[in-house]
């Protein structure tokens, strides 16, 4: 279950530098707009200390982490919704991702040009948000034209959809994104099926200078971004893309020492994945055996058969039981045999809601 997050931002805010750092994919990064014309896609392993601990306990032949997919989408500029700055192509790429990571420039540097001539993170955020809203407004207006005809004929489904479309249109005309509209559960499902840009969850990535990362909380730009995000119920993480490039070249103890010297508790990659997980309501379960220990990503609230289906559709179709133990219980027991003897291993049925950190062996028959 690979996740996809689109990294967006105005030109020269540091998004391609960040992408290079976290994926080590080498996307071209230069001091001019549109150095990323085609989307660069990179798949990174999701760091998880629990997977390392499980590997130590089980000693499998192979360990497989879960992954996260990042797409570096070229710099959006004012007028993108009307095709400015290769806008239409970029917007279509955003439609394909699960979440949007918007990199916001929170550093001053005369050597790096800003597309609007000054550093103003809120203006940058609003510029991108408005372009996405305008693109969604156009889509909704077209949809209203088609659905409205059926609604006039008293088609119940069309009438229900039209109500949602009108709610969205009203929000867009007030320059509010779709994710701020309050829907019922049924309306929310229908709204999601419209594949609107502004219904996707957003994570703001405040990119600060190298000399500010250890005291980023006092950065005035960062404070403004956090205030803005709070009104949207959006998440914010603070990184320094240039430092992330350096961290990407280090491993193990060398990496830990470098982070300590900078006064940083975790790398930007770890922050980004943790925040994206929270944003998308995701969690991890594990399968563990002598052949392989593997991490699997699932959506919180999924039941055991659905999680089994992530491995293979046959597992879901022929689901019988899920032999389950929590990560903490397994570690405390020392191994699976001891966990079973201690009564920590449970047999769960079709209605069991899988929890983050569960270690599961699925029983199935097809």
PLM features per residue range, with description:
Residues 1-109, 141, 147:
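Conserved G1/Walker A P-loop phosphate-binding module
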Residues 3-8, 13, 19, 146-353, ...:
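C-terminal-of-GTPase-core extension/linker across diverse P-loop GTPases
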Residues 6, 34, 39-42, 49-51, ...:
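Short capping/connector residues at structural and topological boundaries
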Residues 24, 56, 92, 96, ...:
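Short, intrinsically disordered, mixed-charge
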Residues 25-33, 40-42, 50-53, 82, ...:
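Glycine-rich, flexible loop/turn motifs
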Residues 34, 48-51, 64-70, 84-97, ...:
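Amphipathic alpha-helical transducer elements in NTP-driven molecular machines
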Residues 42-47, 74-84, 95-158, 171-184, ...:
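Conserved Switch II/interswitch segment of TRAFAC-class P-loop GTPases
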